Amino acid sequence: MADKKLKVTLKRGLIGVSDGKIRTIKALGLKKRSHSVIKNDTPEIRGMIDKVSNLVEVEELEA
C-alpha cells in the first residue's frame, strides 16, 4: 500500500473553515488554494483526507 502515492490538491480557500480542518490542511502540507502535494498512501493520510474531503481533490498515482 505504501508504494502508491496520492496527489492532494486544495480546491477551496480556508475562510470560514473550522480550526480543526485548517490544522489538518496544514498538516497535509497544503498552503494555498490550488496548491498540490504528493503523499504516500497510508491509513493516516487517508483519514486526514476524509476529514477535509469537501476541501481537497485526490488523485491516485503509481510510484
Swiss-Prot record:
Domain of life from the UniProt record: Bacteria
Keywords: Ribonucleoprotein, Ribosomal protein
GO MF entry, a single one: structural constituent of ribosome
PROSITE patterns: RIBOSOMAL_L30 (PS00634)
GO biological process, one term: translation
Annotated InterPro entries: Ribo_uL30_ferredoxin-like_sf, Ribosomal_uL30_bac-type, Ribosomal_uL30_CS, Ribosomal_uL30_ferredoxin-like
GO cellular component, one term: cytosolic large ribosomal subunit
Keyword Ribosomal protein: yes
Keyword Ribonucleoprotein assigned: yes
Gene3D superfamilies membership: Ribosomal protein L30, ferredoxin-like fold domain
Family: Belongs to the universal ribosomal protein uL30 family.
Database matches in NCBIfam families: rpmD_bact
Self-association and partners: Part of the 50S ribosomal subunit.
Protein's name according to its UniProt entry: Large ribosomal subunit protein uL30
Recorded name of the encoding gene: rpmD
